[in-house]
A protein has these predicted regions:
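Polytopic membrane enzymes that build or remodel cell-surface glycoconjugates and lipids
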Residues: 1-376
Length: 376
């Protein structure tokens, strides 16, 4: 019970409770090696892609759009950092629960059955326990209702309930500001610069395939898709908004575009349907080959090289540490010494006190000094 109490009292990590529990279960069943955790991330990505396909239950979209949209989402290179990077599991889990809430919401709007309303509520709460970005779900709920306002009664009570949960969630975070890591380390700040971050990130997200889809739809007749395009673009803005207050970059990092990528996927679903209506096998084959070549090629060349460069400082330290048997003092490194400490604990079975920060004192003996000035 002490562990649960500690988690509940941690303003940052209680908002990542689902990933902590899933990681614990993975460690318990399969060990703390990298492969099981990578497979968990990959498995959740597959679930996420199926949930995108599930948007076909919404008659406005239908499976003729949602299935190709899901295929594009599964293969799109831009957000794969959330899949490959084990530490980004909260991002993927938040997506899964938000999409589950969206699908349940659509069914509730269509049927008004209490079970669907309850499912949407539960999925939303699980999303909030996965990452703070799940708080955008009420905005998605309003967007979906607005697009179908002439067909569905105004769900005022349910949206108000979602809003109350969001308000309580925000209060629980900001009331613990003094102890919240990301509210004290300069990661986020409320300032007008978020507008540029939003615009910059949206344009980057649309490039290149969102731009190609918009150009194709404009050429072939954008009017029949106007509600889809409006909904997709508003979805993107809503999903990017929580990350637009970041201070360490002028754009939203690619792993944080995972939820926003649904908007691009819908645009590509519309574009694929337009290509199919041309009734040209050659055009369809060229379009499919171009999408696959770009996304898979980019992922396995440029992105793969990027991932390799990022992990090399840690691998280099582990090789050094294994040959020295510890303790080691980190005097300079491209990442915080805590990264090396955790890596040594997992890979080498070292105790935490065997990897020291620049000003830490070892319990016994003189530590070897390690300095890495590389910039991966």
């Amino acid at each position: 019970m002490q562990y649960w109490s500690n988690l509940a009292n941690d303003a940052l990590y209680r908002c990542r409770a689902t990933s902590i529990v899933l990681t614990y279960l993975t460690d318990s069943v399969a060990g703390d090696g990298a492969l099981p955790h990578r497979l968990v991330n990959l498995g959740m990505h597959v679930v996420a892609a199926f949930l995108v396909a599930g948007l076909g239950v919404w008659r406005r979209i239908g499976f003729r759009l949602s299935v190709p949209a899901a295929a594009f989402f599964a293969l799109r290179e831009a957000h794969q950092e959330a899949v490959i990077w084990v530490a980004a599991l909260p991002e993927v889990l938040a997506f899964v629960f938000v999409l589950a809430a969206v699908l349940s919401w659509i069914r509730w709007l269509d049927t008004r059955r209490p079970l669907w309303g309850a499912a949407s509520l539960v999925a939303f709460v699980l999303g909030l326990l996965s990452k703070e970005s799940a708080a955008v779900f009420p905005a998605f709920a309003v967007l979906i209702w607005w697009l179908e306002a002439r067909n569905w009664r105004a769900p005022v009570a349910m949206i108000a309930l979602f809003g109350v949960l969001d308000a309580l969630y925000a209060y629980s975070i900001f009331s613990a500001k003094d102890n919240h890591l990301h509210l004290n380390d300069g990661t986020f700040t409320v300032q007008l610069g978020f507008l540029w971050t939003m615009v910059h990130s949206t344009l980057r997200l649309l490039w290149p395939w969102g731009a190609v889809a918009l150009a194709l739809l404009a050429w072939k007749g954008i009017r029949i898709w106007k509600s889809h395009l409006a909904g997709a673009l508003v979805w993107i803005v809503i999903a990017l908004l929580p990350y637009s207050f970041l201070t360490y970059m002028d754009r939203v990092p690619s792993r944080h575009t995972y939820l926003a990528s649904v908007g691009i996927a819908v645009l590509m679903g519309c574009a694929w349907q337009t290509v199919r209506e041309m009734r040209s096998t050659a055009v369809a084959a060229v379009a499919l080959a171009a999408v696959l070549t770009h996304n898979l090629g980019y992922l396995w060349t440029k992105k793969y090289d990027q991932y390799q460069r990022r992990v090399e400082p840690t691998e280099r330290f582990l090789r050094y540490a294994a040959s020295n048997k510890g303790p080691v003092r980190i005097t300079c490194a491209p990442y915080g010494y805590e990264v090396f400490r955790q890596a040594a604990a997992i890979r080498l079975g070292w105790s935490p006190e065997q990897v020291l920060g620049p000003n830490e004192t070892p319990p016994a003996g003189e530590p070897a000094e390690y300095c890495d000035t590389s910039k991966p």
